[in-house]
Amino acid sequence: MKMKKNILLLCALCLFCGACKDDESYADQKKKERKAIAAFLARDPLVLLDPNGDTILNIPKINPISQQKFEAQDSMTDVSKNEFVLFGQTGIYMQIVRKGVGEKLKHGDAKRIICRYHEYSILGDSLCTTDRTDYWATSPEILDVSNNWGTITASFYGGSNPGAMTVVYGSTTNSTAVPKGWIVPLSYVNIGRQNDEEGIALVRLIVPHSEGTAAATSNVAPFFYEISYQEMRD
């Protein structure tokens, strides 16, 4: 188990080491990031397959929309048109695939949320980390989340069996901080337990370095995420 986790860690570190050159200024790196995100938005549909030929990710060509249009659509994105709303202040793009069962977080709520995710490196053009595998089946990401008058905060709950995100990035930064990009959807989706009629919340995100992990921030690296959110049982 330790070896497999170390291999995953090394893969992430190698990816970041190739993300920028020592002689690049921060301004150059941000320009490179903007170009990479623009190219990702304009690219042809992206399909990632696992070694068995099963689809990991299928991302049709993205159709960005404004916050104004997003709000006019009851804070939803049209998945049939592959709409992603751009939050201009942060540069985050978000698609709500499913709003999910349950209710939105209210003031005073404090919940433990289970997340499953894929993380795709936009600069590296490859899958970086994921916990949607048999190996991580019993180790999802667990978030301790609270809402204080509309301000939502979250931290990773590592426990004795931490998930892939915590193992990779917590090990390199000694931090339980949740990327700000992961928290944004919690203002729009419902949090509950899956039932026979409704699925749990599912979103897709493009997260620039300033809203990502500490490693993404230090390397000026943008990432694409697909994340599900489910309330944990008491």
Label every PLM stretch briefly.
Residues M1-C20:
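Sec-dependent bacterial lipoprotein signal peptides
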